[in-house]
């Protein structure tokens, strides 16, 4: 399912268990995708972008990822709306204090960006780093998401 958002098009996919993917690039949709899950995801994302939702109540079905990555993705869900933490702080939270770069890689592999809020993780010096592989467009999206959550002042 494709949806238009203030940060561009998002493509969603789900299986019978839960949401499997959110992508900024077109994806092959599961022909057996659960339409109710996709419809709920679309509604909740639209509410988020309208400033009416701060957390998501969607079932996930994450088939890929290492145990470490899944631990990171779980910890990301604990970062409150409108707040940020550094890669180092997140590494300490998951009790792998030297795994700062691995945290960045896990964020990059996050199958459900926005819903699993990897955009809330910033560099040690407070700079925005590492969204969608450090592409310029990715950092613009990260900034927009943080501005939406009022974690950053809006830049005109």
Model-assigned labels for residue ranges:
Residues 126-156:
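…primarily DNA-binding HTH/wHTH and HhH modules…
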Residues 4, 47, 61, 100, ...:
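Short glycine- and Lys/Arg-enriched binding-loop motifs that mark or flank ligand-binding interfaces
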Residues 114-121:
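Short Lys/Arg-enriched helix C-cap and helix-to-coil transition segments
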């Amino acid at each position: 399912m494709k949806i238009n958002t203030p940060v561009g098009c998002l493509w969603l996919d789900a299986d019978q268990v839960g949401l499997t993917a959110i992508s900024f690039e077109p994806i092959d949709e599961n022909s057996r995708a659960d339409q109710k899950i996709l419809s709920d995801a679309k509604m909740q994302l639209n509410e988020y972008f309208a400033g009416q939702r701060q957390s998501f109540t969607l079932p996930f079905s994450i088939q890929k990822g290492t145990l470490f990555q899944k631990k990171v993705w779980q910890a990301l869900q604990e970062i409150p709306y409108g707040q940020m933490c550094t890669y180092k702080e997140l590494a300490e939270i998951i009790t792998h204090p030297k795994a700062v770069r691995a945290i960045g890689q896990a964020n990059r592999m996050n199958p459900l960006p926005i819903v699993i809020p990897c955009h809330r993780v910033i560099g040690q010096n407070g700079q925005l780093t590492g969204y969608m592989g450090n592409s310029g467009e990715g950092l613009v999206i990260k900034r927009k998401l943080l501005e939406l959550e009022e974690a950053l002042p809006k830049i005109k």
